[in-house]
Each structure stands twice: as structure tokens, then as C-alpha cells.
Curated annotation (Swiss-Prot):
<dbReference type="GO" id="GO:0005654">
    <property type="term" value="C:nucleoplasm"/>
</dbReference>
<comment type="similarity">
    <text>Belongs to the SOSS-C family.</text>
</comment>
<dbReference type="GO" id="GO:0070876">
    <property type="term" value="C:SOSS complex"/>
</dbReference>
<dbReference type="Pfam" id="PF15925">
    <property type="entry name" value="SOSSC"/>
</dbReference>
<dbReference type="GO" id="GO:0006281">
    <property type="term" value="P:DNA repair"/>
</dbReference>
<feature type="region of interest" description="Disordered">
    <location>
        <begin position="105"/>
        <end position="125"/>
    </location>
</feature>
<feature type="region of interest" description="Disordered">
    <location>
        <begin position="1"/>
        <end position="20"/>
    </location>
</feature>
<feature type="compositionally biased region" description="Polar residues">
    <location>
        <begin position="1"/>
        <end position="16"/>
    </location>
</feature>
<feature type="region of interest" description="Disordered">
    <location>
        <begin position="38"/>
        <end position="74"/>
    </location>
</feature>
<protein>
    <recommendedName>
        <fullName>SOSS complex subunit C homolog A</fullName>
    </recommendedName>
</protein>
<dbReference type="InterPro" id="IPR031821">
    <property type="entry name" value="SOSSC"/>
</dbReference>
Length: 125
């Protein structure tokens, strides 16, 4: 026969579970704050290419022990129309490209050649 579970025991079990969850949340939040991470956005404002850079904050966001991404950041940011968002990634993609959408120029209707019917070789008219 199963043990009878009264409402008092159930309430006590629930409160212990909630207390344990609360302490785990505090530990996780404390660990994130100790690592120096916060909820505020620490990324600089995106800068369009072709404009001279006045700050050096963007390359500093790339991890300091990875020189290939930093070496790739400088030429790529100076030769493209978009801009790049540096990030720390375990997967090796330390730069996220952001490319602008470019509108195609409107073509006038006079530039399209007129459609001519093809004469049937068997029935010339």
C-alpha cells in the first residue's frame, strides 16, 4: 500500500522544491555577474563602412587570444558595403556579417526588346 500523502506534506515538499529552485537561480545569476556579464548591451553602435573609425572598441570585443579573426576583421571591414559584428563563439564564427539590402535600379520599359512571333517553317504566311 502506498504512503498517504497529506496536503501538509505536499505543501512542505512544494515549498522545499521552490526554495531549491530559488537558490539555484541566485547561484546562476551570481555566477553570471561574477563573470562580468550583464543584461546591458555592451556592443558599440554599428558603423557603416567607408566612414573613418574614431573608436577602437569594435576590434577589442574580439577575443584577445585569437589573432586570425582580428586579422580578418580589418580587411573585411574596409572592403565591403556592410559591417561586421564581432562576437565570442565556440564555433569559430567570430564575425557576423551584416549586409544592407540594396534596391535594384528601376529599368524603363523601353529597354526591353519587343517580342516578335516566330514564323512556322511549315506554314509560312
Amino acid at each position: 500500500m502506498a504512503f498517504p500523502n497529506t496536503s501538509a506534506q505536499q505543501a512542505e515538499t512544494n515549498s522545499k522544491s521552490l526554495e531549491e529552485i530559488h537558490t539555484r537561480k541566485q547561484l546562476l545569476a551570481g555566477g553570471i555577474m561574477n563573470l562580468g556579464l550583464s543584461n546591458t548591451n555592451q556592443m558599440p553602435a554599428p558603423q557603416l563602412l567607408g566612414q573613418p573609425s574614431t573608436t577602437t572598441a569594435t576590434p577589442d570585443l574580439v577575443s584577445t587570444n585569437s589573432t586570425p579573426p582580428r586579422a580578418a576583421f580589418n580587411p573585411s571591414s574596409s572592403t565591403t558595403l556592410g559591417f561586421f559584428i564581432p562576437q565570442d563563439s565556440y564555433f569559430g564564427n567570430s564575425l557576423i556579417p551584416v549586409l544592407p539590402r540594396l534596391e535594384l535600379p528601376a529599368t524603363p520599359s523601353t529597354t526591353t526588346p519587343p517580342i516578335t512571333p516566330i514564323a512556322n517553317a511549315n506554314n509560312p504566311k
